[in-house]
């Protein structure tokens, strides 16, 4: 039986740079920095209410993701308009401005420096 989503992993050729983006611009709290293997590769852990977001160096990854929408993750926020404006001020690339999905809520889509997409969501009150 599957109990939960434990973590999401983003592999990159520059984990330090990508971790800085998620820490400094997106505002996630970094909980750990680690060295992986014997090649000096780095890893960074961000805890999002019990689910890990790991950003890891990977020797097989080179350059930007050419299909950023293939896999996305959503970060739930309390005030999507406020958070949207905050990221715009941080010069985070906007893929899709805030829009409404009936029976779900509001969504805004952004792109990180590696070309991966992530979304802010404000779900409707239950």
Task: Describe each model-derived feature in a short phrase.
Residues 1-19, 71-73, 124-126:
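N-terminal beta-strand motif that seeds the catalytic metal site of vicinal oxygen chelate
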Residues 1-3, 90-126:
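Vicinal oxygen chelate
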Residues 9-52:
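Core segments of cupin and vicinal oxygen chelate
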Residues 23-25, 86-91:
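Short amphipathic alpha-helices in soluble, non-transmembrane regions
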Residues 40, 69, 104:
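Exposed loop/turn and edge beta-strand positions of beta-sandwich/beta-sheet ligand-binding modules
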Residues 43, 74, 107-109:
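Short hydrophobic/aromatic beta-strand element in the GNAT-like acyltransferase core
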Residues 54-56, 119:
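Conserved beta-strand in the GNAT
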Residues 69-87:
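Mid-chain, well-packed structural core segment of small domains
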